[in-house]
Amino acid sequence: MPRPALRSRSKKRKLVRTPGGRLALHVIDKKHDYPKCAICGRPIQGVPKLTSRLERRGVRMPTRPYGGYLCHECLRKGIKLSVWMSASKQE
């Protein structure tokens, strides 16, 4: 029986043939994909592929507004649109 930490179904299982000829079950973590932009779906630059739990604090997310949620181009378009809308409301 595997230990409780390895019973989670969120981990992948892989059958490995041992030198003795028997099959053993290895439990491995799933690979993570790059975070994607919420608008265009492109990978966000400056964000690592690991989970934030595994990374140190200085590497986790960009410090710009919406960092780790929007890519730089969508953020630029959104800021320009909000400035344009606020300017048109004042007129």
Curated annotation (Swiss-Prot):
Transmembrane segments: none annotated. The keyword Ribonucleoprotein applies. One of its GO terms (molecular function) is structural constituent of ribosome. InterPro entries: Ribosomal_eL34, Ribosomal_eL34_C_sf, Ribosomal_eL34_CS, Ribosomal_L34e_arc-type. Gene3D superfamilies: 6.20.340.10, 6.20.370.70. It holds the Pfam family Ribosomal_L34e. It comes from the Archaea. GO terms for cellular component: ribonucleoprotein complex; ribosome. GO terms for biological process: translation. Keywords: Ribonucleoprotein, Ribosomal protein. Belongs to the eukaryotic ribosomal protein eL34 family. This is Large ribosomal subunit protein eL34.
